[in-house]
């Protein structure tokens, strides 16, 4: 009846936009793709963060191998062991959080990491509760949210792309369970991530981590489909990076957050290099180096 009378069918129409939801994009526009960025940090600050990210409540019983990983990371922080990939990645996030950058991390197996290198979420072996050290870096840190997602690459990656296009200050990260599985979201990669800026002037700082390796798991687990991303690369629309040392991944992630350029970052993350004895760095490499 209301339709026949030409009356509105909704009780209230929004006449003015909610300006509190507006984002100031000015700081993130007009930058050259190769702009320099200082990703160094005071080594004492880094050592403090290294200690804090390996601290946990006394009453948290951990699985034996996880406890050993944290014990090794304490040795790495003290200089008694070289740093591996997982610890360098954790420190990159910790430094950004300390400086107030929010981080949103989503994927199918990200708390642990596909190849068990990350362990950003610690599980109590008795009551199944969890503890997330990166949420306890400092009192005024940026928000750190981490979500193991449903098994739909297309749905989750599309949502994270949208989130990243409206949240330029922080880092939005999506990790495939295996990089090859990203083809389940190929239409999102083709139509939005690699071409959205050119078509709609929508800049996006989304980071995609694509773990893969030739070590034993066969087809659909081995290449992260690198060739597809290279074919989609044109006019500096995306960054495709293949870091090979812990220091490189540390400075690469810090650069993605610190510098105001917002371009999608596609990371060909490895398997064997996560624990390779020759793929290590020192804490000085993290404090002083660059990507």
Give the ranges of each region predicted by the language model.
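Flexible, glycine-rich loop/tail regions that form catalytic "lids" or insertion modules at the edges
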Residues: 1-291
């Amino acid at each position: 009846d209301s339709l026949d009378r030409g009356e509105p069918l909704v009780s209230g129409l929004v006449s003015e936009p909610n300006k509190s939801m507006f984002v100031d994009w000015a700081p993130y526009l007009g930058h050259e793709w190769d702009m320099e960025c200082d990703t160094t940090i005071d080594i004492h600050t880094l050592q403090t963060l290294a200690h804090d990210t390996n601290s946990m409540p006394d009453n948290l019983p951990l699985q034996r191998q996880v406890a050993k990983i944290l014990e090794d990371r304490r040795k790495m922080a003290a200089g008694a062991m070289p740093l591996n990939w997982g610890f360098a990645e954790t420190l990159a996030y910790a430094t950004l959080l300390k400086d107030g950058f929010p981080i949103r991390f989503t994927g199918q197996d990200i708390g642990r990491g596909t190849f068990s290198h990350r362990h950003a979420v610690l599980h109590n072996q008795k009551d199944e509760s969890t503890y997330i050290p990166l949420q306890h870096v400092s009192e005024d840190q940026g928000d750190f949210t981490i979500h193991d997602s449903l098994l739909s690459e297309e749905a989750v990656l599309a949502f994270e792309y949208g989130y990243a296009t409206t949240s330029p200050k922080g880092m939005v990260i999506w990790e495939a369970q295996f990089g090859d599985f990203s083809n389940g979201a190929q239409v999102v990669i083709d139509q939005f991530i690699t071409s959205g800026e050119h078509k709609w002037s929508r800049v996006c700082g989304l980071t995609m981590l694509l773990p893969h390796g030739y070590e034993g798991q066969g087809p659909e687990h081995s290449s992260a489909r690198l060739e597809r991303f290279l074919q989609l690369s044109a006019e500096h629309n995306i960054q495709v990076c293949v870091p090979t040392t812990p220091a490189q991944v540390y400075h690469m992630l810090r650069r993605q957050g610190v510098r105001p350029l917002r371009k999608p970052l596609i990371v060909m993350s490895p398997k064997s290099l996560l624990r390779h004895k020759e793929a290590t760095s020192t804490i000085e490499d993290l404090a002083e180096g660059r990507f």
